[in-house]
Swiss-Prot record:
Changing R501A: Very high decrease in catalytic activity. It holds the Pfam family SQHop_cyclase_C. This is Drimenyl diphosphate synthase. SUPFAM superfamilies: Terpenoid cyclases/Protein prenyltransferases (SSF48239). It catalyses: (2E,6E)-farnesyl diphosphate = (5S,9S,10S)-drim-7-en-11-yl diphosphate. Gene3D superfamilies: 1.50.10.20. Its cofactor is Mg(2+); Ni(2+); Co(2+). (2E,6E)-farnesyl diphosphate binds at R132, K133, Q163, W165, R501. Its EC number is 5.4.99.-. Catalyzes the cyclization of farnesyl diphosphate (FPP) to drimenyl diphosphate. Cannot use geranylgeranyl diphosphate (GGPP) as substrate.
């Protein structure tokens, strides 16, 4: 059941020398960034949505004048120089207000009304969460006075067992809609209780600024709780980034440390920091055995748990035997009856990328063969005719493809099952070859400009295909990555992470981490221990 990286032609050709040099420089940069606590810092950059909500909150409360000025400047500058998606532009314009702001042209969205901007922002978002996102985004715009509140039953704001911050967000939006439409009586005590963690001092609850800001805006409508906002707003103002904006989340330290540790452990001579990195992650497991995306996040998820599990198993399986077993137990507890895995809660929709990740993470345990086979079958069943898969927490198509290819090729199979998996992997790899840009890279979608992160994901998949031919898709992709390396050894990339989906957010450290993981896969030799990520 090993899932060893497949050696490629890059290990023996002249271009391989450049690739190895590139890998070495990048690895040194990543190692140098690991802190004394064993974690790789991964702060999140400012985003327009949270910055606008923070500005709205501080303005309404007449608090933190310096932070208000900084947020205003950040929003005006960003709308003028680097406008995001139409929805976020509409939110920012609603908060900034004034004829002058509304009259400025903001990219192609400058003349859109809020409703049109919402439609444009969700255009092409084909996902099982699309209905809820439309409700969320429309309610945000309505609460800011940009459009009317959606005419939906109040139950539409209720959530089944979901991630903790989504529960808070939907309760906050319900309160805002109820008070905005003159129906405060529909707000129940349990709705208010769900918002109270937002009043805790210090970092945002669950490191999620979006959830806290929505909750604080809602708590303004509570005579009982509004007086407590003053102290909290000081902490909110203290979380602004150097550019004056507010990030979506505090960071992704657990996620990036696990992925970086996995990449470093694939190198011919793993650096000494790998063991402290594994130790640091093992200490941060949650009571349910899983892991969240950042230190201090109590909500575990399949994505982070899979990365941590694979890294711990490869770097220090005996040393962290308990953590490995508990992570496996967490994953198995979330497995759905259809054989797939959701991101956060059993019973919610299974996702391709999460299912493929779980299959790869569990594949090293022979006692989990049945669950792994079911997960791989789920992946095969849900492949699209063009060879792609539904996107998940990444906006680019290559992310789901690389995770699926690793699952499809990482577990031994026989007979028709083996042929079925091979066909699925071939279709996925053929799609990558057919959609590669002329510069050797890939973008978020076909024909979009190439970027290092999207290309790195594709390289991981291609490295698992048949032995690469010189000058083929893999060699061209590696040449693209070599050429895009900065003098400091690092990378800058268009962000691909989305949350709430499909809104992009930027964690710059991810570019270095995933390019290193790609280069490690592309230059690896067979290893009896195996590694599937």
């Amino acid at each position: 059941m090993n899932a060893s990286p497949t050696p490629t032609a890059t290990t023996t050709t002249e271009p391989a020398t450049a690739v190895v040099r590139c890998r070495t420089r990048l690895a040194r940069r990543v190692v140098a960034a690991v802190g004394p606590d064993g974690l790789l810092p991964a702060p999140c950059e400012s985003r327009v949505l949270e910055s606008a909500l923070a500005l709205a909150l501080l303005t309404e409360e007449r608090a933190e004048a310096d932070a208000t000025a900084r947020l205003t400047a950040y929003l005006r500058t960003t709308l003028r120089t680097a406008p995001p998606d139409p929805f976020q532009c509409a939110v920012a314009r609603a908060v900034l207000g004034g004829a002058g702001e509304r009259g400025e042209r903001v990219g192609d969205e400058g003349d859109m009304d809020a409703g049109t901007a919402l439609d444009a922002g969700l255009d092409g978002f084909d996902h099982f969460t699309a209905g809820r996102k439309r409700l969320m985004f429309r309610t945000v715009l309505a609460a800011l006075g940009a459009t009317g509140f959606p005419a939906v039953p109040w139950e539409a704001y209720d959530t089944r067992p979901q991630q903790s911050w989504l529960h808070m967000e939907m309760k906050a939006l319900k309160v805002l809609a109820a008070h905005g439409t003159g129906h405060p009586d529909v707000v129940r005590d349990e709705d208010w209780r769900a918002l109270l963690p937002a009043l805790e001092p210090g970092p945002a609850w669950e490191c999620n600024n979006l959830a806290q800001l929505l909750a604080l805006l809602a708590l303004r409508h509570s005579p009982r709780h509004r007086p407590a906002l003053g102290d909290v707003l000081k902490h909110v103002a203290g979380r602004l980034r150097p550019d004056g904006g507010m990030p979506f989340i505090d960071g992704m330290t657990v996620f990036t440390t696990a992925a970086a540790g996995l990449a470093l452990s694939l190198l011919p001579a793993p650096p000494a920091c790998v063991t402290p990195m594994a130790d640091a992650l093992a200490l941060r497991r949650n009571p349910d055995g899983g892991y969240g995306f950042h230190s201090g996040v109590a909500q575990s998820d399949v994505d982070d748990t899979c990365y941590v599990l694979e890294f711990l198993r490869r770097a220090a399986p005996d040393r962290h035997r308990t953590a490995v077993a508990e992570a496996e137990g967490y994953l198995l507890a979330l497995r759905n009856p259809d054989g797939g895995f959701p991101t956060f809660a059993r019973g919610t929709s299974s996702e391709i990328a999460m299912t493929a990740a779980a299959a790869s993470a569990l594949a090293h345990d022979p006692d989990r063969r049945e669950e792994v086979d079911e997960a791989v079958r789920y992946v095969v069943r849900h492949q699209r005719p063009d060879g792609t898969f539904e996107r998940s927490w990444s906006r680019n198509a290559t992310n789901a493809v690389f995770r699926a290819v690793l699952a499809l090729t990482g577990v031994a199979a026989h007979g028709e099952e083996r042929r079925s998996r091979a066909r699925a992997a071939e279709r996925a790899l053929a799609h990558l070859a057919a959609t590669q840009n002329g510069d050797g890279g890939w973008g978020h979608a076909e024909a979009e400009p190439s970027d290092p992160i999207s290309t790195a994901y594709a390289v991981i998949a291609l490295a698992r295909g048949p032995r690469a031919r010189p000058g083929g898709p893999l060699d061209r992709a590696l040449a693209y990555l070599v050429e895009r390396q900065h003098p400091d050894g690092g990378y800058r990339s268009r962000p691909d992470q989305a949350g709430p989906r499909p809104l992009l957010y930027d964690v710059p450290a991810l570019a270095d981490v995933f390019v290193l993981l790609a280069l490690a896969h592309a230059t690896a030799t067979p290893d009896p221990e195996g590694c599937s990520r």
